[in-house]
Amino acid sequence: MLDREGYRPNVGIILINNRNEVFWGKRVREHSWQFPQGGIKPGESPETAMYRELYEEVGLLPQHVKIIGRTRDWLRYDVPNNWVRREWRGSYRGQKQIWYLLRLTGRDCDVNLRATRHPEFDGWRWHQYWAPVDEVIDFKRDVYLGALKELSSRFLRGMESYEDFAARQSSDNR
């Protein structure tokens, strides 16, 4: 299902633990890492889609998490043509996403990447809040950064800013 502008409605999930580290999932049989995300089905609310995707990709149930917040509006990214399925070319531009910030209230052992028959991830880890940004595929990077910035500034008081994190990383690498 695409909107009039060619964007597929989608939800993204930033799952944090009690140390404000983010869940980072490794795509099945790939060397790429990402946050859980997935499409919103017709008639489904973004929140319902978020809980479905959370279970399908991470194996967590609503009782394992607490919603801290969500982005105010859709964040969009365009997918390069060479990444678009042939049958979608011409009408599909990319994804528009509502991002949720969730806190894990359960335990690490509640994560189950094989909760469904078609797992999205075959590995996972906790990562510093800002660290994944540089590892994200380039066409998604601005959306990831936008979601992390908006959600941290609105809901995680005292969190180091991305700019401070990047400056510290730069000076540490010298």
Curated annotation (Swiss-Prot):
HAMAP family cross-referenced by the UniProt entry: Nudix_RppH (MF_00298)
Lineage: Bacteria, Pseudomonadati, Pseudomonadota, Betaproteobacteria, Neisseriales
Residue ranges of the motif Nudix box: 38-59
One Gene Ontology term of the molecular function aspect: mRNA 5'-diphosphatase activity
Provenance organism: Neisseria meningitidis serogroup B (strain ATCC BAA-335 / MC58)
Name of protein: RNA pyrophosphohydrolase
Cofactor: a divalent metal cation
Keywords: Hydrolase
Residue ranges annotated for the Nudix hydrolase domain, each copy included: 6-149
Annotated GO biological process: mRNA catabolic process
Pfam families xrefs: NUDIX
Disulfide bonds: none
EC number: 3.6.1.-
Function: Accelerates the degradation of transcripts by removing pyrophosphate from the 5'-end of triphosphorylated RNA, leading to a more labile monophosphorylated state that can stimulate subsequent ribonuclease cleavage.
Gene label: rppH
